């Protein structure tokens, strides 16, 4: 998913004519490089199958791109309503063919909480995309590594290695520089 902001930046520059400076694009690439460094991939695993991990970020980038393209001046509630209805119809077909009863009633509460958090996060994403340039908003997705590192350490006890520390520092530094570079009101079109 970490390549999605780069894909979105390219799509929005070509089709939406979003303004993104060369310095901003370089900072996005450097943030992406920080992610790659922190994950520490091995060069021994290069194979044609590596194209498959590009499909999810491409789908996520297309979701954000089409959300920006379609939502326009619509109410974010309308956008999330149509997204939810489409998802409910598509996945109801799948679930009806593969239904397994839920074992514990407490799982229903977790499903409801998951739905509420998904609604809130998608509503905020749609609202942010409507207010600003798409390439500006999507760069904040790089903070996922910071939060996942903290959660993995605090909740699951996964140790933090040196690569992750350097990667998190890089993401934070390049993110702050990106906000300073691309966050001026002249470049980011904020609606009043």
Named regions from a protein language model:
Residues 23-40, 163-182:
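Hydrophobic transmembrane alpha-helices of multi-pass small-molecule transport proteins
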Residues 1-3, 70-86, 122-154:
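Helix-helix packing/entry segments at the starts of transmembrane helices
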Residues 4-26, 146-165:
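C-terminal transmembrane-helix exit sites in multi-pass transporters
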Residues 42-99, 190-192:
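Transmembrane alpha-helical segments that form core, pore/gating elements
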Residues 49-50, 106-107, 159-168:
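Loop-to-transmembrane alpha-helix initiation sites
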Residues 131, 179-191:
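Membrane-interface capping segments at transmembrane-helix boundaries
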Residues 37, 54-66, 94-136, 173, ...:
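Hydrophobic alpha-helical transmembrane segments of multi-pass membrane transport proteins
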Residues 32, 88-89, 146-147, 172:
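Small-residue-rich packing faces within the transmembrane alpha-helices of Major Facilitator Superfamily
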């Amino acid at each position: 998913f970490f390549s999605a902001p780069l894909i979105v930046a390219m799509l929005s520059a070509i089709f939406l004519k979003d303004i993104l400076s060369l310095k901003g694009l370089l900072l996005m690439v450097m943030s992406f490089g920080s992610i790659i460094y922190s994950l520490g991939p091995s060069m021994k695993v290069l194979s044609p199958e590596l194209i498959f991990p590009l499909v999810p970020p491409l789908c996520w980038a297309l979701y954000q791109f089409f959300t920006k393209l379609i939502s326009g001046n619509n109410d974010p509630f309308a956008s999330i309503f149509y997204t939810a209805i489409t998802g409910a119809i598509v996945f109801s077909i799948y679930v009806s063919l593969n239904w397994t009863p839920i074992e514990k009633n407490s799982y229903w509460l977790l499903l409801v909480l998951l739905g509420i958090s998904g609604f809130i996060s998608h509503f905020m994403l749609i609202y942010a995309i409507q207010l600003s340039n798409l390439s500006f908003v999507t760069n904040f997705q790089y903070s996922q590594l910071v939060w996942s590192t903290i959660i993995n350490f605090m909740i699951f006890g996964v140790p933090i290695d040196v690569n992750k520390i350097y990667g998190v520092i890089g993401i934070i530094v390049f993110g702050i520089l990106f906000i300073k570079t691309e966050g001026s009101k002249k470049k980011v079109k904020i609606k009043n």
